[in-house]
Amino acid sequence: MPTGQKMSGYDYFKTDSAAENDSTLVILDNEILYDKGRYIDGRLYLQQSFVQDNVNMRFYYDKESNAVLYSDWSAVYTYYPDVKGYRDQNGNTYDTEYEVIKTADGVIYIDFEYMAAVSNISYEYAKEPQRLVLHTTHEEQNEVTIRKNTVVRYRAGIKSKVLEKVKKGTVCQYVGAVDDDWIEVITPSGYQGYVKKNAASDVYTAVPEDTYTEEYQSNLCGYKVNMTWFQVTQRAANAYIDTYLEDVSGINTISPTWYSIADGTGELTSLASDTFVSNMHARGLKVWPLVNDFNNNVDYAAFYSSKTARTKLINNLMQEARQYGYDGYNIDFEYVKKDFADDYLQFLRELSIACQNNGLVLSVDNYKPANHNAHYELAEQAVFVDYIVIMGYDEHYAGSDAGSVASLPFVEDGISRAVSMVPSEQVINAVPFYTRIWTENAGETKSRAVGMQAAMDAMQENGATAEWDETTGQYYCTYETSAGTVQIWFEEDRSIGEKMKLYSKYKLGGVAEWKLGLETSSVWSIISNGLNYAS
């Protein structure tokens, strides 16, 4: 005879009814969490750090101002603790009937329903114990639909206690089959237990519906970007740009490496030239100066976490853009560490809004996506910036084992990973105009970076020949010298042509090249043809 005895929800969720008071359980994607939520003045609030880390990273805590900032594509909103209403970066104020941000026992909380209204989540409230069942994932999952009113049991058997009654039509997550009679499910209220197999439908797959879709306003160019970097280490070098461009064709954007963060206050060092900009505009080229983080005297953790410093840098960049007439910026911040990545992302949000308001295209350079640099959060960047530039090189680098700088599989893997997170029309893949000449001797490996022609000259001077390597999509040669065994994986017309086929395959937004001056002139038509084919 089946038992109808019910297990207490307090026992199942291992919580004490006497201690419940204003606290509430949070079940996040089927994980039971304690002390993350509480009711304050009759409203449910969640810990801000929990929200930022797990639910919506745009609710960012700004340490300097002791406020929570929320950004959409058009504005940054500031919420001060225990104050009704909020304001945007232009000083506009907005009223609320409750405090969006509250503090309790030294902890900062966010009003749940306010946060949920701008988050792509689904949720349910349940009682005994009071709890919030919260789902943030939108990946395909297995489900069943309950076919008749039934019960979910603690164990797979009719003598096991009842966790919950479920009605016909209830959709449950399917965990797995126990035997021919019982299946394991997760109910909408957060119970994980067992139902009779004949009480549920066959298993099917479903993707949770989006509950919130933000409207983006990217400032895309409307054509395939062909951007080349022009490395400038001193201001006088700007005068030589015409020489560098003599045999160049097909580019529509140039990025001179003019700016670097000077200090932790938001000041810049500049190598800018108004003559250069006028010259490029006369040629029909857009100018997106590069800004780097290569000054190792700057405490970047402190810089990114300071709203004052971030704002000063952004204001300085906007002033430079107005003064010189730039068309955009290229951000090349390569030393972002995981412990201040949230602050870096907030900087990009704030910079993107300033660029939108000033008609500037914002592109951001990123490493080939990998687990170790996942904190760069390409998907989140793409919500705000216009173009994500993947640096599709440095597969092997100074100090590594000998190998290709940018083999075809390496490049395609980077592109494939990027477009899985970023709309393809926002992705620009950068190709190298350089390679490395590797020398191995007595177990020691050394290399030097050279341009396309210099690599071919080295091979010819040593009487060597190269053979096409299908695996890397490059010509390869090796020869012996008095210094040791030399290996070269070449970048030239054919290898670049193979890479350009990927632009059509993945429908990318454009190409970039590092760097102007290292190429052979014939490669420009290869790149242009590849982009035209991709259009």
Each language-model region and where it sits:
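Substrate-binding surface in catalytic domains of secreted glycosidases
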Residues: 264-271, 315, 338-462
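Conserved, mostly hydrophobic/aromatic
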Residues: 254, 331, 388, 429, ...
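Glycan-recognition patch characteristic of GH18 chitinases/ENGases
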Residues: 207-316
